[in-house]
Amino acid sequence: MDLTQIQNPSFLKDMSISELEELSEDIRKFLIEELSQTGGHIAPNLGVVELTIALHTLFDSPKDKFLWDVGHQSYVHKILTGRAKEFRTLRQYKGLCGFPKRCESEHDVWETGHSSTSLSAAMGMALARDLKKTDEYVIPIIGDGALTGGMALEALNHIGHEKTDMIVILNDNEMSIAPNVGALHNVLGRLRTAGKYQWVKDELEYILKKIPAVGGKVAATAEKIKDSLKYLLVSGVFFEELGFTYLGPVDGHDYEKLFETLQYAKKTKGPVLVHVITKKGKGYKPAESDVIGTWHGTGPYKIESGDFVKPKEVAPAWSAVVSETVRKLARVDERIVAITPAMPVGSKLEKFHQEFPNRMIDVGIAEQHATTMAAGMATQGMKPFLAIYSTFLQRAYDQVVHDICRQNLNVFIGIDRSGLVGADGETHQGVFDIAFLRHLPNIVLMMPKDENEGQHLVYTAMQYEDGPIALRYPRGNGLGVPMDDEFKVIPIGTWETLREGTQAAIVTFGTTIPMAMEAAERLGKAGVSVKVVNARFIKPMDEAYLHDLLGKNIPILTIEEACLIGGFGSGVMEFAAEHGYHSALIERMGIPDYFIEHGSVTKLLEEIGLTTDAVVDRIHTMIPSKQKRA
């Protein structure tokens, strides 16, 4: 079948099961081929082909609302709703988004990217439906990994209490990105082998009612003691106790079983949870056999061999530099522990776990819990290293404020994927952390210019015992600089001069330092002498350095790959105003006040005007022509 000709999912209703099975194979072949060129979330989507087709066959999108938790498993949904022809632009600048996007299609009713939000949003939609007295189905699809998130459990509690009509699809593939952890995961494991409780209960009730004269009374009594029946028939009754009708487990790759179960769910009043067992990566051997999460999301790959197509890497990944330094320090300090919220692979903590299995804690998709747990460990003299993506640290903001900073606890936060991350787009760009951390009392915030300085700042963080300290580091690889054999402490709040200059100064840090250095070099050749400052401590700033710099009364340009509002440049301006430098000429370059979409980092930097050319032009506008040398 030519998938690019699909306009909407209505054609599915006229297809036989054998035709749907052929369609499943066509979609898998399409995904494997297309994603081999663009990269993307291949394994999650291969696992939900039959489930997605079954949902679109039995329900009527967009009237009926599908909410894809996290959203990376929505590719099949996109194909069935007329977007197959756009897949060669997947996750590229101005191309097809890798997550549901309301502006892309009327079938995308809820945008996602972070986990565990679908149930709360679905509850909102269901309540709105009931108030408006309409009759659409609301169907959140949530994975067993996302179900470990506290927000999902809060929503389950509320939905079950209100007895709201809703069909929750639990897509259980035993993995989020890496293998799942936690007691709830174990409950689901027991349910996978428990059989179909609901049908057994209904069949028993039907048989009892057939008994002459007393059958109805016996059936009523049986209903009253259904809790006992549940415990006899099912080894885990978690969802039933929350007020849901539990259906399953059902094979998520068997159309007959899916249709039977979903039809039953459609007829059931109140909240229903359909437990669907799927195989992540199904149909492509390299992805299907992956047990650690390598094939969750990938770049381009060779279909035949399963080898990834990567540029030759001459420098280590930033995540590896940080985690390897922590691992080395853990060998000499038994107080060091590493904590991750379900990202051991992305944060490069596999080697740490192999060497220190009892000192590496994966809490699952539970950023709030991870953060406060780290605080609790710090109260007992441990040295927790919390490795967390910038975009996911947003989810634990109150815990950083209330539990870590307020108590001034020695927690080292590794803020991975800081800055622009590219293809994952708006929901994953790490551009807000400076603004939401800089104003917090007690915290130290750093970002290195290269991986050698990075290892020294990790060492500095582990030696620091005066409160919380955080290190930002970007996605991707370092610069390939030589690495010192010995670690050293970099004094807190100190900056360094990377290039001397007398006519203007560029103050920046991290990923924008190469841009600043190149701009200063070009300006120098044009007769403009520009100082470049490595502001590696975003907080506290180097006040002595700033006093000296502001005292020279030369134009200052701050650059940051982070949002301007509340950012580092704002801090420099605040310092100048508070200390009476009212004539100082300070301008800022950074991320403007809108969400940055998906695309390559290079293309996104061009869009927002954060390039070497733009820096050169800005410095020229800041320096009066009469001050420039010929």
From Swiss-Prot:
It is an enzyme of class 2 (transferase). Mg(2+) binds at D144, N173. SMART domains: Transket_pyr (SM00861). Its cofactor is Mg(2+); thiamine diphosphate. The keyword Transmembrane does not apply. Its EC number is 2.2.1.7. Pathway: Metabolic intermediate biosynthesis; 1-deoxy-D-xylulose 5-phosphate biosynthesis; 1-deoxy-D-xylulose 5-phosphate from D-glyceraldehyde 3-phosphate and pyruvate: step 1/1. It catalyses: D-glyceraldehyde 3-phosphate + pyruvate + H(+) = 1-deoxy-D-xylulose 5-phosphate + CO2. GO terms for cellular component: cytosol. Thiamine diphosphate binds at H72, G113, H114, S115, G145, A146, N173, Y284, E367. Binds 1 Mg(2+) ion per subunit. Binds 1 thiamine pyrophosphate per subunit. Keywords: Isoprene biosynthesis, Magnesium, Metal-binding, Thiamine biosynthesis, Thiamine pyrophosphate, Transferase. InterPro entries: Dxylulose-5-P_synthase (IPR005477), THDP-binding (IPR029061), Transketo_C/PFOR_II (IPR009014), Transketolase-like_Pyr-bd (IPR005475), Transketolase_BS (IPR020826), Transketolase_C (IPR033248), Transketolase_CS (IPR049557). It comes from the Bacteria. GO terms for biological process: 1-deoxy-D-xylulose 5-phosphate biosynthetic process; isopentenyl diphosphate biosynthetic process, methylerythritol 4-phosphate pathway; terpenoid biosynthetic process; thiamine biosynthetic process. Pfam families: DXP_synthase_N, Transket_pyr, Transketolase_C. One of its GO terms (molecular function) is magnesium ion binding. Homodimer. PANTHER family: 1-D-DEOXYXYLULOSE 5-PHOSPHATE SYNTHASE-RELATED, 1-DEOXY-D-XYLULOSE-5-PHOSPHATE SYNTHASE, CHLOROPLASTIC. Catalyzes the acyloin condensation reaction between C atoms 2 and 3 of pyruvate and glyceraldehyde 3-phosphate to yield 1-deoxy-D-xylulose-5-phosphate (DXP). Belongs to the transketolase family. DXPS subfamily. This is 1-deoxy-D-xylulose-5-phosphate synthase. It comes from Bacillus cytotoxicus (strain DSM 22905 / CIP 110041 / 391-98 / NVH 391-98). The lineage of its organism: Bacteria, Bacillati, Bacillota, Bacilli, Bacillales.
